[in-house]
Amino acid sequence: MLFRSVSQSRYEQKVKTAFFKIGQTKIELLESTDPEGPVGKFIEKKGEGVHHVAFAVEGLQQTLDFVADKGVTLIDKAPRKGAEGLNIAFLHPKSTFGVLTELCEDPNK
């Protein structure tokens, strides 16, 4: 099998997610379950397509502190729980060339 799919619902974010892992790369598909949720509003405003890119990091809080010190605007000033039990935080697209950027850390590593 070339890829593995894992699905789950993120009720607080009003989305369903599906992950496809190909080697070391993981692709996450998002399906809005509510037009008033963050992804539903994004689709209404910008249309379907790429929502964000994500990067795995070690030391998420330290990374957030580092990029904030460099002038990057943070959406999340502290990590929060995301899909697959990861700790996540988002950087504002105005600071990342118009691309919503997610930083992820596996708390089990």
Go through each PLM region and give its residues.
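Vicinal oxygen chelate
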Residues: 18-21, 40-109
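A short beta-turn/loop motif at secondary-structure boundaries
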Residues: 10-12, 45, 80-83
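Short, small-residue-biased leader/transition segments that mark boundaries at the very start
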Residues: 1-2
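A short, acidic/glycine-rich surface segment
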Residues: 6, 36-41
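Carbohydrate-associated surface elements
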Residues: 29
